Regions:
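Bacterial N-terminal signal peptides that target proteins for export
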Residues: 1-12
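Predominantly soluble domains enriched in secretory-pathway, periplasmic, or organellar proteins
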Residues: 16-335
Length: 335
């Protein structure tokens, strides 16, 4: 065989192998998963974050509100106000068990930290902690405020911040990891109405909360435990607020289907991005830890919108199916 023909065959073979490898790589599923609560469908959707393809649905309690996940991505915990907390095996895509938090307790938010699952029980005006390894509720703590709803935990996992919608206050629980009787609670009144969405700044110095009842934002200094600033953004239904790693604040205004982007340092508005044609109902905002993207669950639009946080534009939209009602979103990286 002539050397030139041999060379051509080698080049063609290498090209074919490269094509096969490329196809194989494109067909290899990513270990990352989006966990999307489908409130209308009462299910947890497990989604390929690259394609938006729904890999499976796990039935959970009625009208699920929030979802937490373990660092290894293998277990998720879903709160249903009427049917307790579902414990989910993410790789197997099945519910392992359901935790009864008590009649009329109305669990709403869930947060995984230090091997435990913290949850709010809005009906009892309490927070609680569940040990998934022992499958038992370790304790419940009375907050003494109405509408105990969401929660956020400081990086040291010792201080928790909880908005109380009915009392127009934020509760601070110090020493929460130690359990009773080691912790203490303090209620901080906020000037706005119905605080709900909240988050801590990346440096932990400020807590921001969106006041859903009047379209504003209140900022608390985490050292002095005082409200330092409030301003009205004239929003119609600001129910979720999240920080990005670089210090932006994202607020989802479900009433107008708009994402508001603020610069936390200057307190200035950067952009208002239309993400749906109209009212999206209750929604969810999840920010990737690397700050590259944000995912918005738009309940009444039955979609998940992907935001490029560099360009602040819509990068993709994933349809979740008719009458699915996507809300809270979390991220599982299967290890």
């Amino acid at each position: 065989m002539r050397p030139s023909r041999l060379l051509i065959r080698c080049v063609l073979s290498l090209a074919a192998l490269a094509t096969i490898a490329s196809v194989a790589a494109s067909q290899t599923p990513s270990p990352a998963r989006l966990l999307v609560l489908l409130r209308n469908a009462s299910a947890l959707a497990i989604v390929d974050p690259a394609s938006g393809h729904v890999l499976g649905r796990v039935p959970v309690g009625k009208d699920p509100h929030e979802v937490a996940v373990t660092p290894d991505g293998k277990m998720a915990f879903v709160a249903s106000p009427s049917e307790g907390i579902s414990v989910i095996d993410v790789p197997a895509m099945k519910e392992l068990r359901r935790v009864d938090t008590g009649a009329l307790s109305a669990p709403h938010d869930v947060l995984y930290a230090g091997g435990k699952v913290y949850f709010t029980a809005e009906g009892f005006k309490t927070i609680g902690r569940y040990d998934p390894a022992a499958n038992k509720i370790e304790w419940m703590l009375g907050i003494g405020q109405d509408g105990t709803h969401m929660m956020v935990l400081a990086k040291d996992q010792q201080t928790m911040w909880v908005p109380n919608r009915g009392s127009n206050s934020i509760s601070v629980i110090d020493g929460v990891a130690g359990g009773p009787p080691k912790f203490r609670t303090t209620a901080i009144p906020v000037p706005g109405k119905t605080p709900e969405g909240l988050d801590l700044s990346p440096d932990g110095r400020e807590l921001w909360t969106a006041t859903r009842g009047d379209g504003g934002v209140s900022i608390i200094d985490t050292t002095s435990r005082k409200v330092t600033q409030s301003f009205n953004l004239k929003l119609t239904d600001a129910n979720r607020l999240k920080f990005t790693p670089d210090g932006k604040v994202l607020i989802l205004d479900g009433g107008t289907g708009t994402l508001i982007v603020l610069d936390a340092a200057s307190r200035k508005e950067i952009k208002r991005l239309k993400v749906a044609p109209g009212d999206t109902g209750d929604g969810g905002v999840f920010v990737m830890p690397d700050g590259s993207r944000a995912y918005l669950g738009l309940r009444d639009d039955h979609s998940v919108v992907v935001i490029d946080l560099k360009t602040l534009e819509i990068a993709n939209r994933f349809a979740m199916g008719p009458n699915s009602g996507p809300g809270c979103i979390n991220w599982a990286f299967l290890r």
